[in-house]
Amino acid sequence: MSGNTGERPFADIITSIRYWVIHSITIPSLFIAGWLFVSTGLAYDVFGSPRPNEYFTESRQEIPLITGRFNSLEQVDEFTRSF
């Protein structure tokens, strides 16, 4: 026996005017907010990732590659000291 859950069918939702009035504002707003978050550099600050011009410095031009399995912590410390 299947019962009625009381939910609106999806087809009714996406064909309603109310759905498109709400989403015609929220979807572009989310896109613009994401674009501003990345373009202003706030994403780099929030997540702590280096900016594109900070990957290589004057003193360190090689790739910071971890090569040892057992001394990886020392290598990470060495790389972070050069920043």
Swiss-Prot record:
Highest taxon, organism lineage: Eukaryota
Keywords: Chloroplast, Electron transport, Heme, Iron, Membrane, Metal-binding, Photosynthesis, Photosystem II, Plastid, Thylakoid, Transmembrane, Transmembrane helix, Transport
Record's bilayer topology term: Single-pass membrane protein
GO annotation, cellular component aspect: chloroplast thylakoid membrane; photosystem II reaction center
Disulfide bond found in the keyword field: no
GO biological process, one term: photosynthetic electron transport chain
Subcellular location: Plastid, Chloroplast thylakoid membrane
Any one GO molecular function term: iron ion binding
Entries under Pfam families matching the protein: Cytochrom_B559, Cytochrom_B559a
Cofactor: heme b
Cofactor info, note text: With its partner (PsbF) binds heme. PSII binds additional chlorophylls, carotenoids and specific lipids.
Subunit structure: Heterodimer of an alpha subunit and a beta subunit. PSII is composed of 1 copy each of membrane proteins PsbA, PsbB, PsbC, PsbD, PsbE, PsbF, PsbH, PsbI, PsbJ, PsbK, PsbL, PsbM, PsbT, PsbX, PsbY, PsbZ, Psb30/Ycf12, at least 3 peripheral proteins of the oxygen-evolving complex and a large number of cofactors. It forms dimeric complexes.
Function as written in the Swiss-Prot or TrEMBL entry: This b-type cytochrome is tightly associated with the reaction center of photosystem II (PSII). PSII is a light-driven water:plastoquinone oxidoreductase that uses light energy to abstract electrons from H(2)O, generating O(2) and a proton gradient subsequently used for ATP formation. It consists of a core antenna complex that captures photons, and an electron transfer chain that converts photonic excitation into a charge separation.
Family membership: Belongs to the PsbE/PsbF family.
Protein's recorded name: Cytochrome b559 subunit alpha
Organism of origin: Psilotum nudum (Whisk fern)
Gene that this polypeptide is encoded by: psbE
